[in-house]
């Protein structure tokens, strides 16, 4: 098992790749909320924990939180982010 951190910025359509978006625009969503991402991860059956009082490193003034997800070693970060995004549309 490996752990992965998911920030809402990773799937935010308003962000550019340089601003932290990790998925292609066709998978990105508008205004992703931590709770919505956590709900999708839960529906996917993945073990996770939520850290609410954390700031995204590129925007230390904004507290948005992140989710720590446990994944199989064969699962890629991009694969999981795309799956989460698809489930949010």
From Swiss-Prot:
Keyword Ribonucleoprotein: yes
Superkingdom of this protein's organism: Archaea
Subcellular location: Cytoplasm
Record Pfam families: SRP19
GO cellular component: signal recognition particle
SUPFAM superfamilies documented for this protein: SRP19
Keywords noted in UniProt: Cytoplasm, Ribonucleoprotein, RNA-binding, Signal recognition particle
GO MF annotations in UniProt: 7S RNA binding
Coiled coil: none
BP term (GO), one: SRP-dependent cotranslational protein targeting to membrane, signal sequence recognition
Chain segments annotated as transmembrane: none
Predominant place of localization: cytoplasm
Family classification: Belongs to the SRP19 family.
Subunit (UniProt): Part of the signal recognition particle protein translocation system, which is composed of SRP and FtsY. Archaeal SRP consists of a 7S RNA molecule of 300 nucleotides and two protein subunits: SRP54 and SRP19.
Record's function text: Involved in targeting and insertion of nascent membrane proteins into the cytoplasmic membrane. Binds directly to 7S RNA and mediates binding of the 54 kDa subunit of the SRP.
Annotated HAMAP family: SRP19
Protein name: Signal recognition particle 19 kDa protein
Species of provenance: Methanococcus maripaludis (strain C7 / ATCC BAA-1331)
Lineage of producing organism: Archaea, Methanobacteriati, Methanobacteriota, Methanomada group, Methanococci
